[in-house]
Amino acid sequence: MKLKNIHLYNYVVIYTKNCEIYINKGNEQVYIPPRMVAIFEKNISFNIETIRKGDGVLYESFDMKHELLTSLRRVIEPSVKFAAESYTNKRSFKERIFKVKSCSIVIDLFKRLKDNGSPEFTAIYELAFLVSKCENPSMFAISLFSSVAVTFSERIVTLLFSDLTRKWKLSDIAEEMHISEISVRKRLEQECLNFNQLILDVRMNQAAKFIIRSDHQIGMIASLVGYTSVSYFIKTFKEYYGVTPKKFEIGIKENLRCNR
């Protein structure tokens, strides 16, 4: 199945249990083979293609919570040192996805972390072990240290997610953050973003999650993410992801279930 415009707002860890994945961004492509764990940096977007390679669930994943990342940074920090320019050098898209040298221990740790099977203190060190098995642990450390802070756009995303049924305007964001509209616009421009695209990304991200994780009808989902017209929601969804909500639902839910 192929999907466009996948946006990640958190670090995501994925295990390609019964599939291979092709990630595309511009002219760059990342291939993740079957039965591999990989870590995706937050605030990236890409197109994705999944190809089944066995029976059962295609892949499993979980988001890394901000608190866990902050603790992970404290654990890693004493053991790594980088020149100042390491944090300012532009990294390619490929350098924002970290493949983990997978073995039975790594896969077991992935499952424990996904299922919250360990106390928080233990989970931090389990995650640190997982990271140490990355193909390029130093590059992951640079990623972590560079992005652990909450950006301005992330603060807006959190605000938008708090009530997607609201008809958000730039003036609403300015009022909530106690700054001017011009300041909001300029600070988003510094991150190469604009408000209209950001709110579209957030609405479509949440719509996809509702389709995957709930039994809501398309009309209900449209309303929950701020659309009064179901037909306009369907049109927007198709333009954004490259498939209609119904085809997305059929494809995703069939692929996530056991292949019969």
From Swiss-Prot:
Keywords: Activator, DNA-binding, Transcription, Transcription regulation. Residues 154-251 form the HTH araC/xylS-type domain. InterPro entries: Homeodomain-like_sf, HTH_AraC, HTH_AraC-typ_CS, Tscrpt_reg_AraC-type_HTH. Residues 171-192, 218-241 bind DNA. SUPFAM superfamilies: Homeodomain-like (SSF46689). The keyword Secreted does not apply. GO terms for cellular component: cytosol. SMART domains: HTH_ARAC. The keyword Acetylation does not apply. Disulfide bonds: none annotated. GO terms for molecular function: DNA-binding transcription factor activity; transcription cis-regulatory region binding. Homodimer. Positive regulator of the expression of the 987P operon for the fimbrial protein in enterotoxigenic E.coli. This is HTH-type transcriptional activator FapR. It comes from Escherichia coli.
